[in-house]
């Protein structure tokens, strides 16, 4: 039965080429615009190198530091002291890292350059949380970190700019005119991996500006924390352990009280949660309230046009449908036939829509993501994309062909045969 419907659909495509092209292009455009929204969400949510384990990550993007007399309130990043007392001692996670971002001029001892690069000051745990692919060398070690030695890992593009085809391992680079020895070279991370992205990574203990911070009585600083759980089931245990660590920290009677109220999962961040204005956690309700009207608009506008096209096509076959009903075809079978035949068109449009959505994302990434973000195959082609494409294709098929199919199925045999 379905094989016959498929043959009939192909025959209709050949007979009504203009109508078929309009239907396919309308479907492709609708699906592509919807998938751009899906892709943007997917890039913010799913894992890809060097953030392959996003589903197991927790993020501390900010803290509160309030004076005990309530005269001073700060929403900021944490100091290295908070990191050492509240994050490093955690027992439940697999790994913990603290990260401070900066921009600085990177040059060579014998060649002065003036271009700024992104530098992440971090710790050895960084290389456990993120899965960078090393082209040569290795990360800076625990001993380097403990001793505050000026060691760096650099991205491959920067390595080529500075050293050409030479091996940079063991050579010095100047960061803010201070010599640092290169210990490793990694593949360039995409800017979409914002937490991991940089051109240079160095131990924060090698920079005195990040050690022994005294702002807000030693609470405020430059660091954000990222925690890699062994399993998502450990999230609540980790949050509880953090609360206990914060309570112990505040029990010391410091001038400022530390607040670490929000420990976000990757899903929280993808849904729009942030630490601005004291911290806001958003769920699916808030996300869909913002996104659903756009998706509905993108779905319904082409649906109305496609419904007219399908209706016109069905009208030409009223006599055929009436004849089938006269020979015993049920309303359900006629309904399934129209839906199946139209599904061929929507599936073709859906496949084109997937390709078109990737092209649209690439062309429009300057305002959808950031202009410098490299959109990679690993980021885009996930099961989420194909599941979303299939869902919206089937939904579009049901909406555009459903009404004409129901109408033709309900029509009286005599009216259909007489084409009234």
What does each model-found stretch correspond to?
Residues 289-309, 356:
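Internal alpha-helical transmembrane segments of multipass membrane proteins
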Residues 37-107, 113, 220-224:
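Membrane-proximal extracellular/periplasmic loop immediately following the first transmembrane helix
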Residues 5, 25, 384-420:
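C-terminal membrane-exit region of the final transmembrane helix in multipass inner-membrane proteins
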Residues 125-139, 150-280:
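Mid-to-C-terminal secondary-structure elements
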Residues 3-4, 11, 15, 248-294, ...:
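Membrane-helix entry/capping segments
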Residues 99-100, 108-141, 145-146:
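The feature marks short, hydrophobic/small-residue-biased sequence motifs that occur predominantly
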Residues 18-29, 304, 319-365, 388-396, ...:
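Transmembrane alpha-helical interface segments in multi-pass membrane proteins
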Residues 12-45:
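Short, strongly hydrophobic transmembrane alpha-helices
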């Amino acid at each position: 039965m379905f094989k016959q419907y498929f043959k009939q659909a192909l025959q209709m495509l050949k007979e009504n080429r203009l109508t078929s092209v309009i239907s396919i292009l309308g479907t492709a455009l609708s699906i592509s615009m919807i998938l751009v929204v899906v892709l943007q969400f997917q890039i913010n949510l799913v894992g890809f190198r060097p953030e392959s384990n996003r589903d197991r990550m927790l993020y501390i993007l900010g803290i509160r530091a309030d004076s005990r007399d309530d005269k001073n309130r700060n929403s900021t990043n944490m100091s290295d002291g908070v990191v050492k007392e509240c994050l490093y001692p955690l027992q439940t996670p697999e790994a913990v890292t603290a990260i401070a971002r900066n921009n600085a001029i990177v040059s060579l001892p014998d060649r002065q350059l003036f271009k700024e690069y992104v530098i992440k000051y971090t710790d050895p745990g960084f290389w456990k949380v993120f899965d960078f692919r090393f082209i040569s060398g290795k990360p800076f070690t625990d001993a380097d970190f403990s001793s505050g030695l000026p060691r760096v890992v650099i991205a491959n593009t920067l390595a080529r700019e500075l050293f050409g085809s030479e091996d940079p391992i063991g050579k010095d680079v100047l960061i803010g005119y201070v010599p640092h020895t290169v210990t490793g070279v990694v593949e360039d991370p995409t800017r979409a991996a914002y937490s991991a992205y940089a051109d240079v990574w160095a131990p924060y203990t090698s920079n005195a500006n990040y050690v022994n911070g005294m702002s807000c009585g030693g609470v405020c600083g430059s660091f954000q924390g990222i925690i890699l759980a062994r399993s998502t089931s450990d999230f609540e245990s980790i949050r509880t352990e953090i609360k206990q660590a914060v309570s112990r920290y505040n029990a010391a009677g410091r001038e400022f009280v530390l607040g670490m109220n929000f420990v976000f999962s990757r899903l929280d961040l993808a849904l729009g949660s942030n630490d601005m204005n004291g911290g806001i956690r958003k769920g699916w309700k808030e996300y869909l309230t913002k996104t659903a009207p756009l998706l509905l608009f993108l779905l319904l506008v082409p649906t109305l046009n496609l419904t007219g096209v399908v209706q016109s096509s069905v009208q030409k076959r009223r006599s055929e449908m009436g004849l089938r009903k006269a020979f015993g075809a049920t309303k359900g079978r006629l309904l399934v036939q129209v839906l199946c035949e139209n599904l061929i068109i929507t599936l073709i449009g859906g496949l084109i829509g997937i390709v078109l959505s990737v092209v649209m994302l690439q062309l429009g990434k300057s305002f959808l993501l950031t202009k410098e973000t490299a959109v990679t195959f690993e980021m885009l082609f996930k099961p989420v994309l194909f599941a979303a494409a299939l869902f919206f294709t089937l939904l579009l098929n049901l909406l555009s062909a459903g009404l004409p199919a129901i109408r033709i199925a309900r029509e009286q045999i005599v009216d259909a045969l007489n084409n009234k």
